[in-house]
Amino acid sequence: MQKVKLPLTVDPIKDAQRRLDYVGYYAANQLERLAESVVNVLSDAQVTLSFYVDPQKLVVMKGKVQIDVDLECQRCNEPYKQTLECEFTYSPVANWDQADDLPEIYEPIEFNEFGEIDLIGTVEDELILALPLVPMHSSEHCEVSAQEQVFGVLPEELAKKPNPFAVLANLKQK
């Protein structure tokens, strides 16, 4: 199957009337905001999109995206590979006042001044939202063992260190 680059913007109304489906990719170097959020972008973003008109006569853009990235483990500070996958369903609106009228199953997305939506920006937003809050290896692959981790009780050597704010207490007494 041939790899096809996806357009940067689309006209969702025309695409929905034609019931268009897109299967393609965005190159890793096009996803600048995602690249700033991860250690490394390892693959192109594989994207599948479908445009259609639902029974309520609403234009709908439904899609899936998948990409491989390197994230920094917050336990051992070593990079590890993570596959980000997400699905989304949008319905374009002319302004945010119309967003309140949409069914809850659809996320609103606003048209630009040309009646198009920023497709690459939307896909990149979804990938950024799919990033884990605290990236970590699975415990069997992490270099930091459970014995080295502190869970609520300080080790004695840390508890015996002098409080750096004790100097402030002396100033308060003067």
Curated annotation (Swiss-Prot):
The keyword Ion transport does not apply. Keywords: Ribosome biogenesis. InterPro entries: YceD, YceD_bac. One of its GO terms (cellular component) is cytosol. One of its GO terms (biological process) is ribosome biogenesis. The keyword Cytoplasm does not apply. It holds the Pfam family YceD. It comes from the Bacteria. NCBIfam families: PRK11193.1 (NF008395). Belongs to the DUF177 domain family. Plays a role in synthesis, processing and/or stability of 23S rRNA. This is Large ribosomal RNA subunit accumulation protein YceD. It comes from Haemophilus influenzae (strain ATCC 51907 / DSM 11121 / KW20 / Rd). The lineage of its organism: Bacteria, Pseudomonadati, Pseudomonadota, Gammaproteobacteria, Pasteurellales.
